[in-house]
UniProtKB/Swiss-Prot annotation:
EC numbers, comma separated: 7.1.1.2
Biological classification of the source: Eukaryota, Metazoa, Chordata, Craniata, Vertebrata
Subunit structure: Core subunit of respiratory chain NADH dehydrogenase (Complex I) which is composed of 45 different subunits.
Protein name: NADH-ubiquinone oxidoreductase chain 4L
Family note: Belongs to the complex I subunit 4L family.
Topology of the protein relative to the lipid bilayer: Multi-pass membrane protein
GO BP terms, alphabetized: ATP synthesis coupled electron transport
Catalytic function, reaction form: a ubiquinone + NADH + 5 H(+)(in) = a ubiquinol + NAD(+) + 4 H(+)(out)
Length: 98
């Protein structure tokens, strides 16, 4: 494993640990998810370019499309929750609350 792959893997693990540790606020969770998607995109792109596997060259672009959809849905959920409750706590997303 080269240093580039190790650094990208470390960025993914750091984002994952941030998602697990700071999951009380929705905004920090969304930022950690975006960091994970960005590191996955860079890892896939470098792997495909290094292996000269041209048939899978569209895969990172498809991942970016899904990341953009995830970001749009997450931000709309953040706006809805902050307008309704005034905060961005994840505990406000519990549907079993009265």
């Amino acid at each position: 494993m080269t240093m580039v792959y190790a650094n990208i893997f470390l960025a993914f693990i750091t984002s994952l640990m941030g998602l697990l540790m700071y999951r009380s606020h929705l905004m920090s969770s969304l930022l950690c998810l975006e960091g994970m998607m960005l590191s996955l995109f860079v890892m896939m792109t470098i792997t495909i370019l290094n292996s000269h596997f041209t048939l899978a060259s569209m895969t990172p672009i498809i991942l970016l499309v899904f990341a953009a959809c995830e970001a749009a849905l997450g931000l709309s959920l953040l706006v809805m929750v902050s307008n309704t409750y005034g905060t961005d706590y994840v505990q406000n997303l519990n549907l079993l609350q009265c």
